[in-house]
Structure formats: structure tokens, C-alpha cells
Swiss-Prot record:
Gene symbol of the encoding locus: TIP5-1
Domain writeup: Aquaporins contain two tandem repeats each containing three membrane-spanning domains and a pore-forming loop with the signature motif Asn-Pro-Ala (NPA).
PROSITE patterns: MIP
InterPro entries recorded: Aquaporin-like, Aquaporin_transptr, MIP, MIP_CS
Family per similarity comment: Belongs to the MIP/aquaporin (TC 1.A.8) family. TIP (TC 1.A.8.10) subfamily.
Record field: transmembrane: 24-44, 57-77, 89-109, 144-164, 171-191, 222-242
Residue ranges of the motif NPA 1: 87-89
Origin species: Arabidopsis thaliana
Name of the molecule in the record: Probable aquaporin TIP5-1
Length: 256
């Protein structure tokens, strides 16, 4: 029995560092970098266009459109490689649902975090006249309320991801990412003025790291992670129960 333990551990470790797994991590890095660059950059762009006053409707509309388009594209370009997570909340939900292993999820998170920080650093270095914006909670909201709101938004987003990636629905490859982007854009429109409509811990982490302030950072982790995990459990166990032989089909569906 003692000989089987290191062998099993070694095989799992080799799987996490296999060439296919490394391709997934690189894919997540590229897609997350692109998304964060567009999502955070759109806020800086709207600030520039409106001379610093982003309190009007266009202050939310521009980032919402950018989030929708960038997320659709980011998910699409990595869909067949890594599953197009682009979001630690999605990765966490996939791990909770048993579609990826916990070690793989940790490497996904690492790729996503590094990509987010790098994207925000690029914005900081290239746009010298502005600081990198961070997600903030509106004055009329509490931290708990913002966490609940972010959790609900993440639930809707992750539920859409599970629906779009379900091979039993037979959706064309290009359709799923479009719907995922639509939901993200709608969520930003709905919650942008209140919590920022992040839904993505990596995006919030990268901007906070570069800006140098982690105030209320827990809001953008606890809410999305719990919301995403709940969506995974509800989809797989209540709405569309997964069959016993789901292992091979769902594995192919998310690209890992």
C-alpha cells in the first residue's frame, strides 16, 4: 500500500504538468489578459472621453459593451483548449462540479491572476495620465449587500456557462460564447453603479494589485465564488441532472 501512494501522487502531478495541461494554462493566460485589458481599459477610455465624469449613462454603457464583446471573444478563442473559463469563479464552479481537478483549478487560477496583473500593468505603463481603476462599492451599499449582488451576478453568469458548454444541447461552437458575453454585459449594466459588476475575482485582483488598494476585495471573491459554485450545483443536480456516464462528455465539452 505504501508504494501506491507516491505512484498515485506522481501520476496526478504529471497530469497537471502535462503538455496538454500547460497549453490550457497558456490559453487561460492569453484569454484572461485580453479580457481584463478590455474590461479595465474601457473604464479608462470612458473616463478620457467624458473628461473624468463617468457618472452619466455612458460611464456604465461603454464598460458593459466592452465586457460583453471582450468576454465573448476571450471565451471563444480558448473554448476548445482550456474551456474558456477566463474567470476564477467559473474555474471554481467547474472544480465543484467535478469537471476539472482541484490541482488543475489552482493552476488555472494562477494563470488568470498573473494575466490580470500583467494586463493592468500594461494599462498603467501606457496610460500615464490615469490611474488604473478599481472596483468600488456604492455609498448606499454595505459590504454584505455588495457580496450578495456579486454572488447573484456570478450565479447567472456561471449558469449560462454551464448551459452553453453542455454538449447535450448541441449548440454550435460560436453560439455559447456570444450568450456568455451578453449575460456579462447585461450584468454590468444592472450592477455597475452599485458594485461595479465584476463577477470576476481575477479582474478585481489585478486592478487592486496595480492600484495598491485591496479595500473590499473580499466582496469580489466571496460573492462570485459562492455564486458560481451554487450555479454549478443547481445546474448539475436540479435543473439538468447529469447522467452517470457524464465524465467523458463533459470533459470534452470544457476542453480539459
Amino acid at each position: 500500500m505504501r508504494r501506491m501512494i507516491p505512484t498515485s501522487f506522481s501520476s496526478k502531478f504529471q497530469g497537471v504538468l502535462s503538455m496538454n495541461a500547460l497549453r490550457c494554462y497558456v490559453s487561460e493566460f492569453i484569454s484572461t489578459f485580453f479580457f481584463v485589458l478590455a474590461a479595465v481599459g474601457s473604464v479608462m477610455s470612458s473616463r478620457k472621453l467624458m473628461a473624468g465624469d463617468v457618472s452619466g449613462p455612458f460611464g456604465v454603457l461603454i464598460p458593459a459593451i466592452a465586457n460583453a464583446l471582450a468576454l465573448s471573444s476571450s471565451v471563444y478563442i480558448s473554448w476548445n483548449v482550456s474551456g474558456g473559463h477566463v474567470n476564477p469563479a467559473v474555474t471554481f464552479a467547474m472544480a465543484v462540479a467535478g469537471r476539472i481537478s482541484v490541482p488543475t483549478a489552482m493552476f488555472y487560477w494562477t494563470s488568470q491572476m498573473i494575466a490580470s496583473v500583467m494586463a493592468c500593468l500594461v494599462l498603467k505603463v501606457t496610460v500615464m495620465e490615469q490611474h488604473v481603476p478599481i472596483y468600488k462599492i456604492a455609498g448606499e451599499m454595505t459590504g454584505f449587500g455588495a457580496s450578495v449582488l456579486e454572488g447573484v451576478l456570478a450565479f447567472v453568469l456561471v449558469y449560462t456557462v454551464f448551459t452553453a458548454s453542455d454538449p447535450r444541447r448541441g449548440l454550435p461552437l460560436a453560439v455559447g460564447p456570444i450568450f456568455i458575453g451578453f449575460v456579462a454585459g447585461a450584468n454590468v449594466l444592472a450592477a455597475g453603479p452599485f458594485s461595479g459588476g465584476s463577477m470576476n475575482p481575477a479582474c478585481a485582483f489585478g486592478s487592486a494589485m496595480v492600484y495598491g488598494s485591496f479595500k473590499n476585495q473580499a466582496v469580489y471573491w466571496v460573492g462570485p465564488l459562492l455564486g458560481g459554485a451554487t450555479a454549478a450545483l443547481v445546474y448539475d443536480n436540479v435543473v439538468v441532472p447529469v447522467e452517470d456516464d457524464r465524465g467523458s462528455s463533459t470533459g470534452d465539452a470544457i476542453g480539459v
